[in-house]
Amino acid sequence: MESATPRCAELHSPPHWRVVDFISDLHLQASEPETFEAWAQYMAHTPADAVLILGDLFEVWVGDDAALEPTSFEARCAAVLCSTAQTKAVYFMHGNRDFLVGPAFLQACQVTGLDDPTALNFAGQRWLLSHGDALCLDDVDYLQFRAQVRSPQWQQHFLAQPLEQRRAIARNIRTQSESRKHAGTVYADVDSTAACQWLQAAHASTLIHGHTHRPAEHDLGNGLHSTVLSDWDLAATPHRAEVLRLTDSGLQRIPLA
């Protein structure tokens, strides 16, 4: 099980940052072009000085070499990231679906990796950022799986397989994911006690996270709060696509769907 208080990285916003956007759980995949197009349009037109992606940008990631195929979906996603990074800072945190995104891909796209968790210092306040999956302590089976696939040994073994074999495994994962979606599988929620411990250790008052697909604000007591990001699904009815925007006035949800 995850440590209740993991080491917290630091991100200090430069003085020129006025607008910071947070997104997560887009689960980009070739079979859902509407969501990809909405994301590409958002990335091209957001007024933010920085876009912080807090996990699960991709439905699955089978290795950085997938983006080297010029006609691949991964290459199209890389092009969007590269283009956005020319005009604003782009940061990426691993989620439970895209934990194999590597430094080679991020460097090629001029995207900066974010540790989970990271404390953002912005406008005189500290905001704790996490994907959120490590805080879902009731999901014991998942946390065991997470520990396995995050190990260097497992990742080295998986990435040593041919790309097409890894893609086949990914297709199987997507099939299972669709089955869970249609079955109405409910995501485990963040453990509020653990969230408070993380916040206190980071000397922050608000946790911003994704993963659970339950956008909301929660009062955790003792002046501590959590804000949950929305997932994106432009094929759903109604559409779901939302940005959490931070300025010196605070947080604001920006619906895109």
Over which residues does each language-model region extend?
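Core catalytic region of metal-dependent phosphoesterases/phosphodiesterases
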Residues: 7, 16-19, 28-122
